[in-house]
Amino acid sequence: MAYSFQLGLQDATSPIMEELMNFHDHTLMIVFLISSLVLYIISLMLTTKLTHTSTMDAQEVETIWTILPAVILIMIALPSLRILYMMDEINNPVLTVKTMGHQWYWSYEYTDYEDLCFDSYMIPTNDLKPGELRLLEVDNRVVLPMELPIRMLVSSEDVLHSWAVPSLGLKTDAIPGRLNQATVTSNRPGLFYGQCSEICGSNHSFMPIVLEMVPLKHFENWSASMI
């Protein structure tokens, strides 16, 4: 989860988030090299009086600055397209959870079970227990099995919302009348926090998301106790 004065991304918890962080580093390296080259050339132009009168007419230079940007864009686009396909691909999910956004709470329905559904509201600051996080705790957590593919169906009952859990690399728009889907796969157990990431009204900041990833045996025990 995030912490005060954090400079980097949250620790990756899913394969998709790991790929996104690798892509971020890959792209940042390319941008850094280009920026360094541009700054070096600018500094040379400002500090020296050297000129090359035939530069603008050189066929070789024109060829280089046409082909090189195209190659750089391809180097950025190919990993990006690969990750986009990964995010859209859902292979044999073991569980489907339907998530509905409301003003201003989330409701969840485990569609593989007959009567397993609940609403999830933020816990007010006055009701927090020692060690709990302000504006991030909920009264009903979403309990899911770890290391298994889970399909999340996301929609909304009223206005636009966005269901986002950064450490899992998830951000899916909740649009009234439309179902969007995302894949949830956690590499380890734990609590993972998120929030609504689409301005949806006066209490937009009070729509936290808490996923509790547990081993499959614990999930089966929890689901049996909820039915």
Curated annotation (Swiss-Prot):
Keywords: Copper, Electron transport, Magnesium, Membrane, Metal-binding, Mitochondrion, Mitochondrion inner membrane, Respiratory chain, Translocase, Transmembrane, Transmembrane helix, Transport. Cu cation A2 binds at residues 196, 198, 200, 204. Mg(2+) binds at residue 198. Signal peptide: none annotated. Cu cation A1 binds at residues 161, 196, 200, 207. It comes from the Eukaryota. Pfam families: COX2, COX2_TM. Its cofactor is Cu cation. GO terms for cellular component: mitochondrial inner membrane; respiratory chain complex IV. Binds a dinuclear copper A center per subunit. Its main location: mitochondrion. The keyword Zinc does not apply. One of its GO terms (biological process) is ATP synthesis coupled electron transport. It is a multi-pass membrane protein. Its EC number is 7.1.1.9. The keyword Translocase applies. Residues 46-59 are mitochondrial matrix. It is found in: Mitochondrion inner membrane. It catalyses: 4 Fe(II)-[cytochrome c] + O2 + 8 H(+)(in) = 4 Fe(III)-[cytochrome c] + 2 H2O + 4 H(+)(out). Residues 1-14, 88-227 are mitochondrial intermembrane. NCBIfam families: CoxB. Component of the cytochrome c oxidase, the last enzyme in the mitochondrial electron transport chain which drives oxidative phosphorylation. The respiratory chain contains 3 multisubunit complexes succinate dehydrogenase (complex II, CII), ubiquinol-cytochrome c oxidoreductase (cytochrome b-c1 complex, complex III, CIII) and cytochrome c oxidase (complex IV, CIV), that cooperate to transfer electrons derived from NADH and succinate to molecular oxygen, creating an electrochemical gradient over the inner membrane that drives transmembrane transport and the ATP synthase. Component of the cytochrome c oxidase (complex IV, CIV), a multisubunit enzyme composed of 14 subunits. The complex is composed of a catalytic core of 3 subunits MT-CO1, MT-CO2 and MT-CO3, encoded in the mitochondrial DNA, and 11 supernumerary subunits COX4I, COX5A, COX5B, COX6A, COX6B, COX6C, COX7A, COX7B, COX7C, COX8 and NDUFA4, which are encoded in the nuclear genome. This is Cytochrome c oxidase subunit 2. The lineage of its organism: Eukaryota, Metazoa, Chordata, Craniata, Vertebrata.
